[in-house]
Amino acid sequence: MAKKIDAYIKLQVKSGSANPSPPVGPALGQKGVNIMEFCKAFNARTEKMEKGMPIPVVITVYSDRSFTFETKTPPASYLLKTAAGLKSGSPRPNTQKVGTIARAKIQEIAELKAADMTGADVEAMTRSIEGTARSMGLVVEG
């Protein structure tokens, strides 16, 4: 018989550095999940990734307090900032541009994000990520 799902918890945790402090501890503690068990499993799964990269994670909590989790790809905004070498986007993206990014790099990001986006082709995802880049104050070249 399948386990009864009690809750889904969505968090963004930095790769390789999950610990019981907020936001992980309170979110899991409310559902009675073993926090250290999650932290060890998450850190083991993300140890090969760049340290400090924000990783969206969906934790499925079952009624017997056991859990499973699924990691996603980093947010497009993080990948764009990293590719353009920026610390943050523009506070006024319509008037103040902060950098440029090649369309080929956006295509790479779209292909990386394809695992998380269902039902969209790579061309549509590329256009979506171009829009994200423009809203961050990046100029798309190429």
Curated annotation (Swiss-Prot):
SUPFAM superfamilies: Ribosomal L11/L12e N-terminal domain (SSF54747), Ribosomal protein L11, C-terminal domain (SSF46906)
Aminoacyl-tRNA synthetase is among the record's keywords: no
Record PROSITE patterns: RIBOSOMAL_L11
Biological process, per Gene Ontology: translation
Keyword field: Methylation, Ribonucleoprotein, Ribosomal protein, RNA-binding, rRNA-binding
GO cellular component: a single term: cytosolic large ribosomal subunit
Record note on modification: One or more lysine residues are methylated.
Gene3D superfamilies tied to this protein: Ribosomal protein L11, C-terminal domain, Ribosomal protein L11/L12, N-terminal domain
Molecular function GO labels: large ribosomal subunit rRNA binding; structural constituent of ribosome
Role: Forms part of the ribosomal stalk which helps the ribosome interact with GTP-bound translation factors.
Subunit structure as annotated in this protein's UniProt entry: Part of the ribosomal stalk of the 50S ribosomal subunit. Interacts with L10 and the large rRNA to form the base of the stalk. L10 forms an elongated spine to which L12 dimers bind in a sequential fashion forming a multimeric L10(L12)X complex.
NCBIfam families assigned to the protein according to its UniProt record, in alphabetical order: L11_bact
Record family assignment: Belongs to the universal ribosomal protein uL11 family.
Protein name per the record: Large ribosomal subunit protein uL11
Lineage: Bacteria, Pseudomonadati, Pseudomonadota, Gammaproteobacteria, Alteromonadales
The gene coding this protein: rplK
